[in-house]
């Protein structure tokens, strides 16, 4: 019996090793669950509580009312309008509902964006360290993630100077995260503007992973 042939672009993607850590900690947690020192999880980006009651009630109500069919490909219009309103009230940013697409999480959104915007061989500049899956999304689009080392003094974020120094004829854009996983740091707003201005001047794209935006607190 012959083995199924896996596409080369899939073979380039490395395992997500944090899940192995999660398995090991879950096993240890079961051992100490009823002891005087239960485990506090700090290993994976998932809270130890469930969805708020309002969310649970809304989900149950949608099922009860039969709202379980296909939506528009871009998501529920009413939800897109509410998200547009949230950007207006939270950031005073005018983001029209027509520019909003609902996906099954940030990973799906980033992967779709990469598939839509990155050609084979395109380079995407990213800080190192950064969330491993983000560079895999670039690889899935047959692009090349260029990891630029960062330091604690730089808050593990890219600067405009570093982006300009690393930019080549093959560069397509940057993929940033703020707040970042795994470092938890945010990029300074003015630095982000400088990066975007430079990338835009080169005809490039600025992708930003903001999955932890709601966990950002001003001093």
Model regions and ranges:
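Conserved PLP-anchoring active-site segment centered on the Schiff-base-forming lysine
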Residues: 116-138
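N-terminal small-domain helix-loop-helix segment of the aminotransferase-like
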Residues: 11-105, 112
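Conserved PLP-binding active-site segment in aminotransferase class I/II-type PLP enzymes
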Residues: 1-15
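A short helix-loop-beta submotif of the ANL/AMP-binding
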Residues: 140-146
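Short acidic capping loops at alpha-helix termini that bridge into adjacent secondary structure
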Residues: 94-100, 120-123, 170
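Helix C-cap/helix->beta junction micro-motif
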Residues: 28, 141, 201-202
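Active-site phosphate-binding strand-loop segment of PLP-dependent enzymes
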Residues: 146, 152-219
